[in-house]
Amino acid sequence: MIEQLRQRLRALEKPAEIADGLGGLPLGVAAIDAALGGGLARGALHEIAAVSEAHLAAATGFALALAAREHARLVWIAEDMALAESGAPYGPGLDAFGLAPERLLTVSVARSHDLLWTMEEALHCRAVRIVIGEVRDSAVSTVALRRLSLAAAKSGVLALLLRASPTDETSTAATRWIVGAASSVIPGRERSERTRNPEINAEVASGFRVRAFSASRNDEEIRPRFAAQLVRNRCGPTGSWILEWSDSDERFILAPAQSVAAPALDRPHRQIARQVA
């Protein structure tokens, strides 16, 4: 019995190559998908942490965008306190991500222990393809993480553990991401309409609320941006990218490089110029 358990745990330590032809969930960015061996491994646990609590909405939006790309039913599990502080998933916001609200089942629990148990049970259900658990407790036991990884591997369901802040604790997760809000723009008006308030950018990047801009603007034009760091990857290299979510294509794209002011040309001092004149 103990040896069998050890073999199962050793299997989790291998690169996140999914058996039974499940493959990976591509993000749509060639460099990232290559680093992930084709995409985010299905049948595995992945951790997504916000840079800080101020960026939790951005991390949430990143998770929702991944869920939108799967085009399947999903379960969202959150603690009562998290729902009270951050709000529940918001229908129009989900629609903007290409995630039909009827595909989502939301479950609220009282404690982080209940959340992890519910998440594990949901992973046993083959009727869903993604299970997202939003945990506020910074410390999650290694045993609980292993159980989640084993449950995901058995069912082939994609498991996302959403955290309010980064952690260095040992994990069986196939990948670990740290996500923050990047400056969002309105296409064609990058110079004048760039938003630099992280709280506003985070709300734009989340499907939890109405888009942060006024109704006088065409909110569908606003493309949320994410500063995504892949800090742990069992399948290959790590890296960091500024990603933009395209609602119309339901995929991530690399954000265009921000333009910078051209350096001033050398010119003669005003007094010298006057003398020459």
What are these regions (language model features)?
Residues 1-76, 93-102, 258, 266-277:
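Detector for small/aliphatic-rich hydrophobic stretches
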